[in-house]
């Protein structure tokens, strides 16, 4: 038996690939959801099937708070479906947060084509029985194919080991080991069997830009979007509420508890004839806290979301102001060279506002972080959907401006003129001179300048040149990098 198990593990290693082609127009890709109580290994199974660490896996209940999805595709095995990891459905005394999570997960089950019900070999609880009863009785779920998997079966199980599962009324169970990758190939074969000739369902929705915001089918796997937009900010700044306000429906779990969204969620949106991929990231916490196991992977994915994005909305809390940690986020965005804009959320909660309130807020903001003076800023209320459409208009505008290319001759002419205007006012030495410059990238707006002496170009002169570039080429919100090189022939 040991050899057979070893062979099965080897087989499972080559079953899964997530490199999928674009979905054919009109073709629907089915959805498979992993369900179970907390801490039975759902996220570990999700990651093992994907062969990458996408969901958070940690031996602590309640880690996956939102529905994660990824496409599994392998042409030679005729495998093509969306795999979804749902939160644990066993919260006995649901508070406002867990109730919202439960509703999100139950909604996901109703949209699934096949359900993988995961159980723990070592422990059957009342939560398992309760979830099983729900799957059997819920009208929109009861007729769906369900694969019952017994996880943590690292050794072969005999009939005695499975007796308790049979007493639950499960006529067929599949022993697996998510960590050891045992029998994952068989699991995929069962999924393939149930999905054969099924029309499938669409996992993501197309969001109309109209006020009605009616949902229509749209494939998640298509990547013909204009740009990738990430929403970042400290915990409880309203990121998920903003995502829901933009989408017009509750795609992410929303709660007033900081850190509710621990997993990045991608949503493909269409506004008129323009598309974008919207990412709601986990709240960035201070480095000392993200070192903890529970938040580590979420923090890393947030950084990756910023790195992989084309444009970023940095969300601020109007009542909390611009704190030291917001400065760290802004510095990170500057460091990564990402175009971004500031959205001051919860503006409706500010009392006794006047015509000068916003101006005073900006002045205070710029005094704490002068670089923000050239960044677009807008006040919004995600919960009230105040100026959310204007925020999206600004995002599309910023995306368009982030590809600004300037001819080398024009750059050289303007920069030399500006430096002539500056004269010696920015240097105690002889006037700094630029011999030649060229643009090497658009986002960030990166210039290489060959100069007489690099040390002559002090920070005040560099700031002056960046300001002139911003004003001349409409680069508000787009980081500018000036790289100076000495040219001493």
From Swiss-Prot:
Assigned protein family: Belongs to the TRAFAC class TrmE-Era-EngA-EngB-Septin-like GTPase superfamily. EngA (Der) GTPase family.
UniProt domain EngA-type G: residue ranges: 30-199, 227-403
Example of a GO biological process term: ribosome biogenesis
Keyword Repeat part of the UniProt annotation: yes
Entry keyword set: GTP-binding, Nucleotide-binding, Repeat, Ribosome biogenesis
CDD domains: EngA1 (cd01894), EngA2 (cd01895)
Protein name stated in the entry: GTPase Der
Binding site for GTP 2: 233-240, 280-284, 345-348
Binding site for GTP 1: 36-43, 85-89, 151-154
InterPro entries: G_ENGA (IPR031166), GTP-bd (IPR006073), GTPase_Der (IPR016484), KH_dom-like (IPR032859), KH_dom-like_a/b (IPR015946), P-loop_NTPase (IPR027417), Small_GTP-bd (IPR005225)
Lineage: Bacteria, Pseudomonadati, Spirochaetota, Spirochaetia, Leptospirales
GO molecular function: GTP binding; ribosome binding
PROSITE patterns xref list: G_ENGA
Task of the protein: GTPase that plays an essential role in the late steps of ribosome biogenesis.
Residues annotated as signal peptide: none
Gene3D superfamilies: 3.30.300.20, P-loop containing nucleotide triphosphate hydrolases
Organism this protein belongs to: Leptospira interrogans serogroup Icterohaemorrhagiae serovar copenhageni (strain Fiocruz L1-130)
Residue ranges occupied by any KH-like domain in the UniProt entry: 404-488
Subunit structure and binding partners: Associates with the 50S ribosomal subunit.
Pfam families listed in its UniProt record: KH_dom-like, MMR_HSR1
């Amino acid at each position: 038996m040991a050899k057979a198990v070893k062979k099965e593990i080897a087989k499972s290693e080559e079953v899964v690939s997530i490199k999928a082609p674009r979905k054919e127009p009109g073709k629907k890709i089915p959805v498979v959801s992993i369900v179970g109580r907390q801490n039975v290994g759902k996220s570990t199974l999700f990651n093992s099937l994907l062969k990458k660490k996408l969901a958070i896996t940690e031996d602590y209940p309640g880690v996956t708070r939102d529905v994660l999805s990824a496409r599994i595709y392998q042409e030679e095995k005729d495998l093509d479906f969306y795999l979804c990891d749902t939160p644990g459905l066993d919260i006995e005394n649901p508070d406002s947060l867990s109730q919202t999570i439960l509703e999100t997960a139950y909604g996901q089950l109703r949209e699934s084509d096949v359900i993988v019900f995961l159980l723990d070999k070592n422990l059957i609880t009342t939560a398992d029985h309760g979830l099983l009863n729900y799957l059997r009785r819920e009208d929109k779920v009861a007729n769906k194919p369900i694969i019952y998997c017994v996880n943590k079966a690292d050794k072969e199980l005999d009939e005695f080991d499975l007796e308790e599962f049979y007493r639950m009324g499960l006529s067929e169970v599949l022993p697996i080991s998510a960590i050891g990758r045992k029998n994952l190939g068989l699991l995929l074969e069962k999924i393939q069997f149930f999905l054969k000739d099924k029309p499938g369902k669409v996992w993501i929705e197309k969001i109309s830009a109209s006020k009605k915001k009616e949902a229509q089918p749209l494939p998640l796997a298509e990547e013909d979007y204009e740009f990738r937009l990430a929403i970042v900010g400290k915990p409880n700044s309203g990121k998920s509420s903003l995502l829901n306000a933009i989408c017009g429906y509750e795609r992410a779990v929303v709660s007033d508890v900081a850190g509710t969204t621990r997993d990045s969620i991608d949503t493909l949106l269409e506004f008129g004839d323009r598309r974008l991929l919207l990412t709601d990231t986990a709240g960035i916490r201070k480095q000392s806290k993200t070192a903890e196991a529970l938040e580590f992977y979420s923090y890393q994915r947030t950084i990756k979301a910023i790195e992989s994005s084309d444009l970023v909305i940095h969300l601020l809390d109007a009542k909390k102001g611009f704190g030291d940690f917001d400065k760290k986020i802004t510095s990170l965005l500057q460091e990564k060279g990402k175009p971004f804009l500031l959205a001051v959320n919860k503006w409706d909660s500010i009392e006794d506002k006047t015509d000068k309130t916003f101006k005073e807020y900006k002045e205070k903001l710029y005094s704490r972080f002068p670089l923000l003076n050239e960044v677009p800023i807008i006040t919004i209320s995600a919960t009230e959907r105040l100026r959310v459409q204007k925020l999206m208009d600004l995002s599309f505008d910023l995306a368009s401006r982030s590809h600004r290319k300037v001819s080398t001759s024009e750059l050289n002419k303007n920069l030399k003129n500006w430096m002539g205007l500056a004269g010696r006012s920015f240097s105690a030495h002889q006037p700094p001179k630029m011999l030649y410059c060229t643009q090497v990238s658009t986002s960030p707006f990166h210039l290489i300048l060959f100069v007489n002496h690099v040390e002559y170009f002090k920070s005040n002169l560099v700031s002056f040149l960046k300001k002139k570039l911003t004003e001349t080429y409409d680069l508000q919100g787009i980081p500018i990098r000036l790289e100076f090189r000495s040219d001493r022939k």
